[in-house]
């Protein structure tokens, strides 16, 4: 059995990253895909569940886990910690399951250094106006928080060229199809095909 592929997906807040990942999970793909559940110290939002969307823990707990080297990567965003469990990722990949990591560019850089075979995807909005509108429609943040998120979004988007793939989330269905295409392409690359069909290839090449 071949190992799963680790996919990193990053985007500014409000770009539709979470919706895109959920759209992928609901689609009929040929591959077993999971989303890594991160640990965070931020306050739980309405509709979120512990253990489903995030593992919500205290700052003290998070900092103890950092010292124990529990995280494959971690970062501080808007005064809150976010981190990815090393054991969870390794277990899923070894079981042949593709894993999606929803992390920012800082975390992506850490993962790329530690797991160079991982593939990274950056998601962009079709325009700044659209991004602003999406943030407003959430109805969760004040004007000052939205202004801060817009400013941070511009900074985050500067890093798009550090990624392997780029998706523009203008049309949702097309964006989901683009994501599925990326997954399919990676599974068809020589490295994964060779591992998956090693016995078949060996028999074909016998004299």
Swiss-Prot record:
Enzymatic class: transferase
Keywords: ATP-binding, Cytoplasm, Kinase, Nucleotide-binding, Transferase
GO CC terms: cytosol
GO molecular function: ATP binding; guanylate kinase activity
Highest taxon in the source lineage: Bacteria
Alphabetized InterPro entries for the sequence: GK/Ca_channel_bsu, Guanylate_kin-like_dom, Guanylate_kinase, Guanylate_kinase_CS, P-loop_NTPase
Residues of the Guanylate kinase-like domain: 4-184
One Pfam family from the record: Guanylate_kin
Chief site of localization: cytoplasm
EC number of the protein: 2.7.4.8
The UniProt record lists the keyword ATP-binding: yes
Subcellular location: Cytoplasm
Residues annotated for ATP binding in this entry: 11-18
Presence of keyword Nucleotide-binding: yes
CDD domains listed in its UniProt record: GMPK
Catalytic activity: GMP + ATP = GDP + ADP
Role summary: Essential for recycling GMP and indirectly, cGMP.
Family: Belongs to the guanylate kinase family.
PANTHER family according to UniProt: GUANYLATE KINASE, GUANYLATE KINASE-RELATED
HAMAP family xref list: Guanylate_kinase
Protein name (database record): Guanylate kinase
């Amino acid at each position: 059995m071949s190992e799963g592929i680790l996919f990193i997906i990053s985007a500014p807040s409000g770009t539709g990253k979470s919706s895109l990942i959920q759209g992928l999970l609901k689609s009929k793909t040929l591959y077993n895909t999971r989303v890594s559940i991160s640990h965070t110290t931020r306050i739980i939002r309405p509709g979120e569940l512990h253990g489903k969307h995030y593992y919500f823990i205290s700052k003290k707990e998070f900092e103890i886990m950092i010292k124990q080297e529990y995280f494959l990567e971690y970062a501080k965003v808007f005064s809150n910690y976010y981190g990815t469990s090393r054991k969870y990722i390794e277990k899923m990949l070894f079981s042949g399951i593709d894993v999606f990591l929803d992390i920012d560019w800082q975390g992506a850089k850490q993962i790329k250094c530690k797991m160079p075979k991982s593939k990274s995807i950056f998601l962009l909005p079709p325009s700044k106006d659209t991004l602003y509108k999406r943030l407003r429609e959430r109805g969760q943040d004040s004007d000052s928080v939205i202004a801060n998120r817009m400013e941070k979004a511009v900074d985050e988007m500067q890093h798009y060229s550090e990624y392997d793939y780029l998706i523009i989330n203008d049309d949702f269905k097309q964006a989901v199809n683009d994501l599925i295409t990326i997954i399919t392409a990676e599974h068809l690359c020589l490295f994964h095909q060779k591992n998956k069909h090693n016995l078949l290839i060996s028999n074909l090449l016998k004299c």
